Amino acid sequence: MSLGQNISRAILQWPVSGLVNHKSLPENPITELKLDPARPIVYALKTSSITDLMTLQQCCEDLGLPGPFTPLELNGQLLPRYVCLDRPPPLFGKRSKPLPFLQEFHQLLDLHKQDPALDIQVVPVTLFWGRAPGREGEEASGWNIISSLAPNRLKKALIVILKGRENLVRFSPPLSLRHMADKHGTDEAIAHKLARVARTHFSRQQLAATGPKLPNRNLLFKQLLDSNVIQQAIEEEAQREGISLEKAQKRAHGYMDEIASDFSYRLIRLGESFLGWLWNKLYRGLSVNGAEKVRQLAQEGHEIVYVPCHRSHMDYLLLSYVIYHQGMVPPHIAAGINLNFWPAGPIFRHGGAFFIRRTFKGNPLYSTVFREYLNLLFAKGYSVEFFTEGGRSRTGRLLPPKTGMLAMTLQAMMRGLDRPVTLVPVYLGYEHVMEVNTYHNELKGSRKEKESFLQVLGILRKLRNYGRGFVNFGEPLTLNNYLNEHVPSWKEHIGEEERPEWMAPTVNQLAELLMTRINGAAAVNGLTLSALALLAAERHALTRDELQAQLNTYLDLLKQVPYSPHSTIPDEDAKTLLDQAMELNKFEVSEDKLGQIVSLDRYQAILLTYYRNNILHLFAMPSLVAALIERCEGISRSEIVARCIDIYPLLKTELFLRYEEDELPELVDALLAELQRQQLIEARDGGFWVNPVNQTRLLLLAESIQETLQRYAIVLTRVLAQPRIEAEQLEADGLMMAERLGTLHGINAPEFFDQKLFSTLIHTLRSEGYLDPGCKPDLGRFQALADNIVPLLSTKIRRTIQAGNRL
């Protein structure tokens, strides 16, 4: 380090430490980027800046990494631990000679030629001092200090003063110089290539972190009104409604004003501070997984479309906060028009929300304006977010997808976007959903409460510790790749006004796949596991030891037979998870001489079905296998596989399960092996039997799927009893029988009486060929499926269903 740098560091030490508050991404680069502290590390930065280097030094010290000022000695040579591509521009006069970064890269590569064991990790680091992207229509100015990408020393000093508290240090995955040297050599041309790659990388990092300039609403409205598509729609509206062109244009402008967001970076910054406080007050923390792959896609220039599940109004705030906190650009969010009330509407709008009506039916001008607005967002490169379920789930299960926004996304892509479009499924989970009581009332038949300021105040008044929140980014789905594989001719239809025939079925398939990938990113926690166990128990009560043992059973199943590489399982043991769940005060706990008993009263049991349903899909197949063994002792492996294959299509559609049919034999084998390892079952005489020592644990596992199988049995036996029944009547009779079962046998799960589930089941029976389009049944297949499902129910449930079918 030069004498000048030492003097600068000494002078700036106190100002920088007082003004700069850095945040690193990822939070643990050693683990998340697989950095090897035992191998030499050299940092690559875009611009030589003493404040950047000092900030990086402090950040590295906090993370346990060698800092840029830490000496690096290799083969007896003392080398700088950082390489910078550019000097800052001078205050006056011409730019001084360039930095010797090519020689430095070449020197590092040449060391690998001399020492075959050497492997230097080059870690690109980007420092952001604020992430305001600017706004369209703003004039570029030399005095625009904050947005300057190459500030001189005076500007940099002002940036540190004004934006030091917003500093973000972004570490990128390391580049192995050993790999580079072995594959490409060590001559000067490779050093040039390395420098070019680094420049491209830093440019993409800047765009991924700040995004394109924010839209200017007035300019945006003018662009929309000047478009040929909207001009034509205005003319058609005037003719259809018998009004003047001026009035029709004013109506179109009103729709734009109703729809369009008014993104404010200042609000995003204030929101980050407020929401950081809110999460600490509301929750014990946030768990975020899978963000790195999304950052990588953004950096590669993908159009990112976030597709989260919808649990709560809190989802809007949570996901935008997490995306910004993870160093990415908050998206424009499609929000229901019901949220456009004061003061939430203006706040959401400044936070990126654009508002959508429940239906476009009967209003072609509104439909055209909305579609063109969405097309413009994509064309300008803004990320977008929409909830494909269309509304919040009242039961904790994923709802059947609404395909409108997905279809419009695909149509926008077919307008000829010049970059890949990637859909990112997002699983949002909570240990407490603040609207869950309201959901229960709505499912009982109460009218949905209209969103209002008073409702917001009511929620804020109840703020308390709600446990943890979970945001898991699932497996991304790049539309271009999907269409290349499934619709090879799709590019031939780019720019066409008419929708191609393949559009509708492709959108439906994409929607199903997205829902499956959302469920594949599920987050397991102590509350959801405890709810699963207690709701499976007789009278919803277990001793604490039994409950803890059951949590162990669930955890071992998830670890030994993972549902998906994107789902997350807690690191804590069963005891710790149970302690955390009990702190949420959702259970009754009593104690006698033998120990604690954990139970649920009737109301708690109903509310906890919501949390159980968040993870029910993870245990659907383990529960089915357990039920087959528990009800059909001595059953063979081949019979288990055959029955699972027979029942699976119904479960797959209802719970958005990820397995294909040809994967089921291998899955069944893995589950049988794990159940034997846990000593829940025994294999003998060519079959599988319940291990009486651990019968309770197997019974609890088997019980989780019972309510689902009961619904299937209701419909199957009803069709067998009345083969000529119409679809609507079958749905109504199924719902009536479910309510009867609930009354007689104390089944309180709200989704047990959910008409949508009966509708989904009948649709699946049609698509699988059990029913023809006119609802005429294939009685042979119905009987075979009923023979596989009905014996898995308890005797009392079977009798009630049989009695109902005789009425």
Swiss-Prot record:
Pathway(s): Phospholipid metabolism; CDP-diacylglycerol biosynthesis; CDP-diacylglycerol from sn-glycerol 3-phosphate: step 1/3
SMART domains: PlsC
GO cellular component, one term: plasma membrane
GO BP terms: CDP-diacylglycerol biosynthetic process; fatty acid metabolic process
Keywords: Acyltransferase, Cell inner membrane, Cell membrane, Lipid biosynthesis, Lipid metabolism, Membrane, Phospholipid biosynthesis, Phospholipid metabolism, Transferase
Classification via InterPro entries: GPAT/DHAPAT (IPR022284), GPAT/DHAPAT_C (IPR045520), GPAT/DHAPAT_LPLAT (IPR041728), GPAT_PlsB (IPR028354), Plipid/glycerol_acylTrfase (IPR002123)
Topology versus the membrane: Peripheral membrane protein
Motif (HXXXXD motif): 309-314
Reaction catalysis annotation: sn-glycerol 3-phosphate + an acyl-CoA = a 1-acyl-sn-glycero-3-phosphate + CoA
UniProt family annotation: Belongs to the GPAT/DAPAT family.
Name used for this protein in its record: Glycerol-3-phosphate acyltransferase
Species of origin: Aeromonas hydrophila subsp. hydrophila (strain ATCC 7966 / DSM 30187 / BCRC 13018 / CCUG 14551 / JCM 1027 / KCTC 2358 / NCIMB 9240 / NCTC 8049)
